[in-house]
Amino acid sequence: MTLAPYACDPAQSRGRRFAEPAAPTRSDFQRDRDRIVHSTAFRRLVYKTKVFLNHEGDLFRTRLTHSLEVAQLGRSIARSLHLNEDLVEAIALAHDLGHTPFGHAGQDALNDCLKQHNPLSAGFEHNLQSLRVVDSLEERYPAYDGLNLTFETREGILKHCSRRNARQIEAREPDGVARRFVDQKPNGPHWRQPGLEAQLANLADEIAYNAHDIDDGVRSGLLTMAQLQDVELVDQYSFEARQQHPGLQGRRWLFETIRLMLSAQVYDVMDATRAALGQALPGDVQAVRQSAALGRVRKVNGAIS
């Protein structure tokens, strides 16, 4: 597939922290993906849950299954927009490597502990921990710590970051992956947001958990379709599912509702991104990073955010 001019081209990557020779048969972003899949932290995702505890059932999502779903959605969107599928997949597979067990409750508990231990601390941020995993904590290679991923993959992993933590990263790595959280001057030398591949991996994450947390909630018995129909979006697509398939009941009704919701949100992302690209007309990935119009891609007509 031919990449769009505004896509991240591995041949134009800003490189790795430690220089390495290119691989003969794989692009740099393919190598990033492969390193993530073979990492210890990736295997550990199988025991980290999103909402329910691991022992409560083998059909509930874990961080591993969620990451695979995010990668699948991300690749589909990237292909339609002529973006780099390998980069989207690498970011998607790595985005939860630093997440705590017990979902966001675990993150909140660690955050409180860190702030009590050091009142000056910016606390625990799972995106920052994901970056630590790939930069420092993995010990697989003789010449360096971490996975030595490309700048573009690391930039996408750092989805959120407090300014205090970003400044600490910048002190070690000036003009690096955290720069956009430190200095966001309009039309300045730095950028407002990462490339489109990182933004789409972020959106694929939101689409995946918005839909699949519904599935897990109903499967657990904590939610019913009747309760979910109080949510406008669910009500709309559950009605549409029965219009298309009269008499649809039970889990098939739930699955068809979720499928319709997923499809609508994916197409909404594609349409909103194309509209923003038509407004911004970026000539390369750096223009994407600096474009105010493309910083609004996340909003997606309010259906996701």
Residue ranges: model-predicted function:
Residues 1-67, 71-77, 85, 123, ...:
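Histidine-centered, transition-metal-coordinating active-site segments
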Residues 88-93, 202:
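Short alpha-helical catalytic segment bearing the HExxH-like zincin motif
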Residues 94, 98-102, 208:
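Short active-site segment of divalent metal-dependent hydrolases/proteases
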Residues 100-105, 168-170:
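Short acidic, glycine/serine/threonine-rich loops at helix termini
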Residues 81:
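Basic, low-complexity intrinsically disordered segments
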Residues 103-116:
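A glycine- and small-aliphatic-rich helix-loop capping segment at beta-alpha/alpha-beta transitions
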Residues 116-124:
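Aromatic/His-enriched, Gly/Pro-containing loop or helix-boundary segments
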Residues 93-97, 114, 137:
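Acidic, glycine-rich active-site loops and adjacent beta-strand->loop/helix elements
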